[in-house]
């Protein structure tokens, strides 16, 4: 926590959610995929905010982001839905408004902000824009399990967060410094401190093994989602070791449910033609 504010640092990767919103005058109501109730709620909230609750809407969502892993899948869907609804009404909504509407539906990742963002995910406000990331890759290890982010964030963990405040402050300082200097090593150092500290909030049994693997593989660090089940091994993309470490991870963790290779990107919303 920063004072009394909850926060996270975004970690955008090269997986995306694509949303299409079609408006009609056939009466209010939203038609949406059954597995996207948060996006449907976000669409309803956006139309109400823009004074067009009288309109009906159809929503389609296509996403490659793994679900219920704390990887921001619903945040990406929701943010894209809000932006698409605005565009359907001829309005390009600013990221700050997208974030506020998103947070009215559920605690939200800051994926709508460009670059890397320090985000109050409960209030839907950016605390600081941290700039673009240097070239980095992530080998993401999924050992199974799912997380309900709404349920996770409904639990009062302030005492636990405060107990690790010193480590979290140091981790944030290092990540911010690494981003300023474009230094993957410093970013990785900060992320690792945060990941170790988060074991007291959301323990991951395989964390010790992944830390050992990351050190042996020459990674710059490890990271975890704020409320997720995935452990990421952070790599300096300039070292060109992504494919080799991916294969090493598959050999080292044959029990993993899935192992992915991602590229760290900047956040933000894009309009597709």
PLM segments and residue spans:
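Acyl-group transfer acyltransferase/transacylase scaffold of fatty acid/polyketide systems
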Residues: 221-237
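ATP-binding N-lobe of GHMP and related small-molecule kinases
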Residues: 1-69, 267, 273
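A structural signal for short secondary-structure junctions
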Residues: 12-13, 216, 223-227
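ATP-dependent small-molecule kinase catalytic core of the GHMP/sugar-kinase superfamily
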Residues: 94-220, 236-273
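Short, flexible, solvent-exposed loop/turn segments with mixed acidic/basic and small polar residues
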Residues: 18-22, 219-225
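Short glycine/threonine-rich catalytic loop with a Thr-x-Gly-x-Asp
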Residues: 71-77, 164, 222-226
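DPxDG-like acidic metal-binding loop motif
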Residues: 69-95, 111
């Amino acid at each position: 926590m920063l004072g009394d504010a909850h926060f996270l640092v975004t970690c955008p990767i090269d997986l995306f959610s694509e949303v299409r919103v079609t408006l009609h005058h056939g009466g209010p109501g939203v038609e949406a995929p059954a597995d996207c109730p948060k996006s449907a709620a976000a669409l309803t909230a956006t139309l109400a905010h823009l004074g067009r609750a009288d309109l009906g809407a159809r929503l389609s969502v296509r996403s490659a982001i793994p679900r219920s892993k704390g990887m921001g899948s619903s945040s990406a869907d929701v943010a894209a839905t809000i932006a698409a609804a605005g565009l359907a009404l001829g309005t390009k909504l600013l990221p700050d408004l997208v974030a506020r509407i998103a947070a009215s539906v559920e605690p939200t990742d800051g994926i709508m902000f460009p670059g890397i963002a320090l985000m109050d995910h409960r209030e839907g406000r950016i605390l600081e824009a941290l700039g673009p990331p240097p070239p980095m890759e992530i080998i993401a290890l999924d050992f199974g399990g799912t997380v309900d982010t709404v349920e996770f964030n409904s639990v009062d963990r302030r005492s636990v967060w405060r107990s690790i405040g010193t480590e979290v402050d140091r981790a944030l300082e290092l990540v911010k410094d690494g981003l300023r200097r474009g230094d993957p090593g410093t970013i990785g150092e900060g992320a690792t401190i945060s990941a170790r500290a988060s074991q007291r909030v959301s323990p991951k049994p395989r964390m010790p093994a992944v830390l050992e693997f990351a050190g042996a593989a020459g990674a710059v660090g490890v990271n975890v989602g704020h409320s997720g089940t995935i452990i990421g091994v952070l790599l300096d993309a300039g070292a060109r070791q992504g494919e080799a470490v991916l294969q090493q991870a598959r050999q080292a963790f044959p029990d993993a449910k899935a192992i992915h290779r991602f590229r760290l990107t900047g956040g933000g919303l894009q309009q597709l033609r």
